A protein has these predicted regions:
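Noncatalytic alpha-helical scaffold of FAD-dependent oxidoreductases
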Residues: 1-223, 227-231
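Single conserved hydrophobic/aromatic residue that forms the stacking wall/gate
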Residues: 229, 233-240
């Protein structure tokens, strides 16, 4: 199984799969948590997992991604936030209520500036609507974007957010960050205009530096979408 997973299916053929169907959770609720600092949001992610809480879903977006998604989906995101966590908890109703209280205490201690808890299935779906539309939403504010797929240890999320901001200034290109925060999988979207001389090349170098940073922080070059990035820098990192 390790070989199959590590090679992303390239070193074998699956001829039969046995599935176990899980019962649908009795209750599912989502928290929408805003932060004034991206590093605080990263800290909150690590603190939640360290407390032994495993959310059904935990996504992170930065300020640029928040603005784009809110313009696109009107999901009720806090526009003033520098970072946003969407945290879903499921299970028996009593258990979910208790977990909500624990998670809210953790995120407020980490520096959350706002916390909303879904009060209906419609509101829960609305919380997720913005995140699910983040990629097309970013496509509306930039002619082109380059999406990366690196993964880092969750504890390094605050460091990576600071590194991303520094690289954005260095290359003179905006980046909208969308993360699967629960497993440390990053999807930074580097915004550029291929019709502007040099911007594509800068975006590719920016992307290579992101991947390099992932490796330096103890992560890997790709988390879920296979490695199709073919710059010389990525090839060098892939070879180790």
């Amino acid at each position: 199984m390790g070989v199959m997973t590590g090679s992303e299916g390239l070193l074998g053929v699956v001829s039969e799969v046995t599935l176990r169907i899980l019962q649908k959770p009795a209750t599912a609720r989502a928290l929408l948590v805003g932060f004034e600092d991206t590093g605080d949001a990263g800290t909150a992610v690590g603190d939640i997992i360290a407390a032994g809480i495993i959310p059904a879903g935990m996504e992170m977006m930065d300020g640029l991604a928040i603005q784009a998604a809110e313009d696109f989906a009107n999901a009720g995101y806090p526009r003033e936030a520098a970072a946003l966590l969407i945290i879903e908890l499921d299970g028996p109703e009593v258990e979910v209520d208790a977990l909500i209280g624990r998670v809210e205490a953790i995120v407020r201690k980490a520096g959350a500036s706002s916390v909303r808890v879904s009060q209906s299935e419609e509101e829960r779906n609305l919380f997720w609507a913005g995140r699910k539309s983040a990629f097309p939403a970013v496509g509306r504010i930039s002619p082109d974007y380059l999406c990366m797929d690196g993964t880092i240890p969750r504890r390094r999320l605050p460091d990576m957010m600071r590194r991303m901001a520094s690289l954005s200034q260095q290359y003179g290109l905006r980046v909208a960050n969308v993360f699967h925060a629960g497993d440390g999988n990053l999807h930074p979207l580097i915004l550029f205009d291929a019709n502007q001389p040099g911007e594509l090349e800068r975006a590719e170098e920016f992307g290579a530096d992101i991947l390099r940073s992932c490796v330096e922080m103890g992560g890997v070059l790709t988390g879920e979408h296979c490695l199709l990035y073919t710059s010389d820098a990525a090839d060098e990192m892939r070879r180790g």
